[in-house]
Amino acid sequence: MTQTNQAPLVIKLGGAALSCTQTLSQLFGAIAAYQKSAQRQIAIVHGGGYLVDELMAKLQLKTVKKHGLRVTPYDQIPVIAGALAGTANKLLQGQAIADGLNAVGLSLADGGLCHVEELDPELGAVGKATPGDSSLLQAILNTGALPIISSIGLTAEGQMMNVNADQAAVAVAGALDAELVLLSDVSGVLDGKGHLLKSLSKKEANALIEGQVITDGMIVKVKAALEAANDLGRPIEVATWRYPEKLTQLFAGESIGTQFLPQ
């Protein structure tokens, strides 16, 4: 792959997209076409909450969330890590390979990509990721491959941690000094009347959170996007994967969702 001066692009993929083969195929098709035309390095960071929920239900384990974050008891982290770093990662890698991409499956721990520490004792094995050493990831990107990174990390003591995938994507983008797009089930952030907000500042976002217009998991996403915009010093986009025909425009920098602006 020819190198350009364009910053790498990190795409966070989550929600129901992971359960729809056709959607994933269209998404990877758009990534392959854009990667080829723009000669740009791309990495994917993914969650897989629905897989975890399915597995927890099968094992008759209770799912508890606090402020939009999954409570992960330490005795459950092997199950959750297996679902995210194992099943979800390989499902995505397999689909990318089927669509002609050279995909490499990774986690936040590989090559010291992200430092991870316990976020809150009440949440259990839930980690906060910060940018680490991106040299291994950069070496993989330099081969033209597509890294697909799960949001499972390791602490300095080797403890497995579940990291919210939006927050993990922010840390990976920080490590790479990359642009970031957060793809989800929704078209962006909606106001109280259900209309798409084209841009959002921290002050506006906080008002919508206080007014309970932004709730649950969207609070985590919005906070991650605001944090990323400030840390990276560039706008961050929250958009939907539901319109694959618009993704090439999105990857090229055109806004199709809600942009979060650095303060």
From Swiss-Prot:
Protein's name according to its UniProt entry: Acetylglutamate kinase
Keyword Isomerase: no
EC number: 2.7.2.8
Family: Belongs to the acetylglutamate kinase family. ArgB subfamily.
Positions that bind substrate: G48, G49, R70, N162
Catalysed transformations (reactions): N-acetyl-L-glutamate + ATP = N-acetyl-L-glutamyl 5-phosphate + ADP
Leader sequence segment: none
Pathway in which the depicted protein is active: Amino-acid biosynthesis; L-arginine biosynthesis; N(2)-acetyl-L-ornithine from L-glutamate: step 2/4
One term under GO cellular component: cytoplasm
Main localisation: cytoplasm
Keywords (A to Z) from UniProt: Amino-acid biosynthesis, Arginine biosynthesis, ATP-binding, Cytoplasm, Kinase, Nucleotide-binding, Transferase
Group of enzyme by EC: transferase
MF GO annotations: acetylglutamate kinase activity; ATP binding
Any Gene Ontology biological process: arginine biosynthetic process via ornithine
PANTHER family, alphabetized: N-ACETYLGLUTAMATE SYNTHASE, N-ACETYLGLUTAMATE SYNTHASE, MITOCHONDRIAL
Function text: Catalyzes the ATP-dependent phosphorylation of N-acetyl-L-glutamate.
Entry's localization field: Cytoplasm
CDD domains for this protein: AAK_NAGK-NC (cd04249)
InterPro entries hit by this protein: AceGlu_kinase-like_sf, AcgluKinase_fam, ArgB, Asp/Glu/Uridylate_kinase, NAGK-NC
Site (Transition state stabilizer): K12, K221
